[in-house]
Amino acid sequence: MYGNHVLLRSLNPLAVARGDDIPDAVTIDGVSLSRGDILGAATSVAERVAQADRLAVLATPSVKTVLAVVGCLIAGVTIVPVPPDAGPAERAHILRDSGAQAWLGAAPDDTAGLQVLPVRQHARSWHSYPDPHPSSTAFVLYTSGTTGPPKGVLLSREAIAAGIDALAEAWQWTWKDTLVHGLPLFHVHGLILGLLGPLRVGSPVIHTGKPTPELYAAAGGSLYFGVPTVWSRVAADADSARALSGARLLVSGSAPLPVPVFEKLRELTGQAPVERYGMSETLITLSTRADGERRPGSVGLPVAGVDTRLVGEDGAVLPHDGDSIGALQVRGPMVFDGYLNNPEATAESFTADGWFDTGDVAVIEPDGFHRIVGRASTDLIKSGGYRVGAGEIETVLLGHATVDEVAVVGLPDEDLGQKIVAFVVGTGVEPTVLIDLVASELSNHKRPREIRVVDSLPRNAMGKVQKKQLS
């Protein structure tokens, strides 16, 4: 049962019975659970759900979510995490498409006619279950749906194990660490890395509920996860940032970390943050290493087992020269098994020779470091015959004192094809000054043709700017 391939290795009942337990394996919503607590309560959940195929979990940051997820993994039941803030249409789509048979743990007011199975924190069972096959589906994670209804990403147990192990090696992540984060538990970042990662590696995890600078500072961890919005707020709170100076790694992901935030964190904490890259379909495929260079604007090198390549519009593989911008394609053991009920989308996502097309465009340096330009659909702007990456323009603009946030997009233009437009949040913004700044720092054809000052930028639950809403 508990061989090398068991997903949640630190919950080995034999080892826990021998005394390999810790009182604070998971701390969430003000409650600390030991390994024994998690194992006993989650096995009780497993007994109640073992005959199910797929169950929906309303993924609140709570003990119920932790026990529901672990219980399903013990029983071999596929988990369908549902965002707590999902609207009626999105939630109905997820339930219908996934075929979830019931809610497990918490449930929304509108259960869509599905039964709600309880999760009891203090229930205990020590029944022994055979470990499910490594290739079996652990999760159906729904994408953000920027190109239509959300698609269900099929993630196997072995893909998750490979992804966590590769990051543990790159980050030198061990049982001696204490992970701190306050990320949502329905995405790869918060759920796979932020919950299953510690339960596989054996390190305690503290979920802060909300990822505020004050809560991060008070947690006293050695390893911190955050999205750029979180790190931007930490960098703006000097006292909280300095309180993290004793941490071993500050990891940023889910969106590009602005270079000014990178530099401010380095100044205040004494260490540069670690950046990584991934997506629901691939987990994390690129990362700066704990013992390697931390280069602003870069997401580092392929993790163990991952290969990458850049492909041009003509299908040719591009060189790693630091200049060529191409479609980023990846392959590795952590890549998903396809989209649920959508063989056409699955086929379109893979090349004939087996590479997954991420939909992102990137540049690879001669030394193998990767820089993500952005989404091919929104961040690669084709203006006046030039191919321009939105990210480098955003970096320049964020360096100006009047700019707090910025998103650069290409909007239709009869003359240029697309014109470069910058949406800026700031105080005392002077459009001509910003346009001239980009022209002088980069080149004239990369300058925004228009600066639009706005009160805020549209973002999703992970803090990613939703550029398709900007027009």
Task: Annotate each PLM feature.
Residues 31, 46-86:
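Conserved AMP-binding/adenylate-forming
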Residues 161-178, 186-222, 237-238:
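Conserved AMP-binding/adenylation subdomain of ANL enzymes
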Residues 57, 103, 332, 337-338, ...:
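AMP-binding/adenylate-forming catalytic core of the ANL superfamily
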Residues 5-9, 22, 124-142, 149, ...:
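Conserved pre-ATP/AMP-binding loop-to-beta segment of ANL
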Residues 32-36, 138-165:
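Conserved AMP-binding A3 loop
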Residues 221-226, 235-295, 307:
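Gly/Ser/Thr-rich phosphate-binding loop
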Residues 1-48, 53, 431, 436:
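N-lobe entry segment of adenylate-forming
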Residues 309-329, 348, 366-367, 428-431, ...:
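Conserved beta-loop-beta connector loops within the AMP-binding
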